[in-house]
């Protein structure tokens, strides 16, 4: 690493503090894909990584749902003669859509909660019929939690917020 080097990549500085300190110490210019905002306030370079994160998140649920990892042992996939698992996803952005695509492709019953009617309509056109869309509010979330096998948080959350979407008592 040398002074003046320009690094243009996914940096995720909050999650990689030591790396960030090294970049700063060596006077390297770091441009993080995930922090680039377009004129509409969107994060265009974060979109593909977010979709991958959603798909990878569901794959992680498959993995950690196994009893050897402390999970329930439910296979998060449709199997004849067994109750279809329910996957609830909070957020209908790129991450939520990626998670929903992966979960739905295995025949799960998928529910997405979001506050944006337009984004849900757009997602509805992309996703299969085993995906249900609900307005995200406390009442709907609590109803969904009753029979959810996997709950995925797929929303961009302001780092300064101190409130929660789901509480232990839920």
Which functions belong to the PLM regions below?
Residues 1-85:
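Glycine/serine-rich phosphate-binding loop and adjoining beta1-alpha1 elements at the start
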Residues 68-156:
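Glycine-rich phosphate/diphosphate-binding loop of Rossmann-like nucleotide-binding domains
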């Amino acid at each position: 690493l040398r002074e003046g080097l320009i690094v243009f990549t996914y940096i995720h500085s909050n999650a990689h503090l030591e790396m960030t300190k090294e970049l700063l110490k060596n006077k390297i210019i770091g441009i993080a894909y995930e922090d680039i905002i377009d004129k509409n306030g969107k994060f265009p370079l974060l979109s593909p990584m977010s979709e991958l994160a959603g798909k990878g998140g569901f794959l992680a649920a498959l993995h950690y749902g196994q009893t050897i990892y402390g999970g329930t042992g439910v296979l998060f996939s449709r199997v004849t003669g067994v109750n279809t698992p329910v996957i609830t996803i909070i957020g209908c952005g790129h991450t939520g859509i990626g998670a929903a695509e992966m979960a739905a492709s295995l025949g799960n019953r998928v529910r997405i909660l979001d506050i944006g009617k337009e984004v849900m309509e757009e997602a509805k056109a992309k996703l299969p019929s085993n995906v249900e869309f609900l307005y995200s509010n406390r009442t709907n979330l609590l109803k969904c939690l009753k029979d959810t096998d996997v709950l995925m948080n797929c929303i961009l959350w302001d780092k300064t917020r101190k409130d929660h979407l789901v509480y232990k008592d839920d």
